Amino acid sequence: MAELKLGYKASAEQFAPRELVELAVLAEAAGMDSATVSDHFQPWRHEGGHAPFSLAWMTAVGERTQRLVLGTSVLTPTFRYNPAVIAQAFATMGCLYPGRVFLGVGTGEALNEIATGYIGQWPEFKERFARLRESVKLMRELWLGDRVDFDGEYYKLRGASIYDVPEGGIPVYIAAGGPVVAKYAGRAGDGFICTSGKGEELYKDKLIPAVREGAEAAGRNAEDIDRMIEIKISYDPDPELALENTRFWAPLSLTPEQKHSIDDPIEMEKAADALPIEQVAKRWIVASDPDEAVEKVGQYVTWGLNHLVFHAPGHDQRRFLDLFKKDLEPRLRKLG
């Protein structure tokens, strides 16, 4: 069985840069093994939203912590970024913080790419997925430290080299919401990323089997693939506060089509605020009893996930981290 790891999701859409760094430092003190950050150019919400640059945050946190593994969850290396530049950035961080950096990638959302200059109709999944696969291949070639000529359908390199690369390159974690990309994660990823709250069948019968299938097809051991899940959890001894804290993150309860196609945070906020709190809370483990919270989290471990990254929705993250250290962390460690 893969090693159980506990992580903290730094909510870049909710907190300003300095606060987000301090929260990661506190997360290490609370016993977290990792800290991940999203890479949004625009937040899910216009009012009260934030969108600090993920790579600057990772470097700042790297300087302030000793053991936290840091990564994106997730970054899209295919539209507003050139994947060669992302490869260079992560190689530099890998040299600065050896063994503590990974690159989590996904196929992208219009919210972040249209505003930054993508021209034309937002691509369908087929093209976005093809771009992702090509970008990962390109970055891995650059991390070998050799001169690279790359002639892809979307990206090209001519005599390109990254001069400072960490030994072994950078682990790539691939985010998937369905079996097609999950199979690719098993075939080509060092890790796999998904999010909680979507029903047992998705994880137990689709995603994890697809990761294993992809690994087996590539002649790999599926147990070597870190299986990460963002656990949406609103835990507080005050049950009313635990429920109300989910409100800020109402956009997560929109349909996948809305989340991938709406390109304006103002419109995203309008659509999300039209949802009743009961629907918003369905995506979350809402609990005021620590045993109940850990029992619900434990289901994901039995379904095959081993790296649990906790995303708490409330504005008082210090309170959550204190409660995590006192109430949840000792119980969670027993799941391993």
Curated annotation (Swiss-Prot):
Keywords on record: Carbohydrate metabolism, Oxidoreductase
Residues annotated for substrate binding in this entry: 195, 198, 259, 283
Active-site residues (renumbered): 40, 109
One Gene Ontology biological process: carbohydrate metabolic process
Binding-site positions, coenzyme F420-(gamma-Glu)n: 39, 76, 107-108, 112, 177-178, 180-181
Entry's EC annotation: 1.1.98.2
A GO molecular-function annotation: oxidoreductase activity, acting on paired donors, with incorporation or reduction of molecular oxygen
InterPro entries according to UniProt: F420-dep_G6P_DH, F420-G6PD/mer, F420_G6P_DH-rel, Luciferase-like_dom, Luciferase-like_sf
Tree of life domain: Bacteria
Catalytic activity entry: oxidized coenzyme F420-(gamma-L-Glu)(n) + D-glucose 6-phosphate + H(+) = 6-phospho-D-glucono-1,5-lactone + reduced coenzyme F420-(gamma-L-Glu)(n)
NCBIfam families given in the database record: F420_G6P_DH, F420_G6P_family
Self-association state and partner proteins as the record states: Homodimer.
Record-stated family: Belongs to the F420-dependent glucose-6-phosphate dehydrogenase family.
Role, per record: Catalyzes the coenzyme F420-dependent oxidation of glucose 6-phosphate (G6P) to 6-phosphogluconolactone. Appears to have a role in resistance to oxidative stress, via its consumption of G6P that serves as a source of reducing power to combat oxidative stress in mycobacteria.
Annotated protein name in UniProt: F420-dependent glucose-6-phosphate dehydrogenase
Organism (species): Mycolicibacterium fortuitum
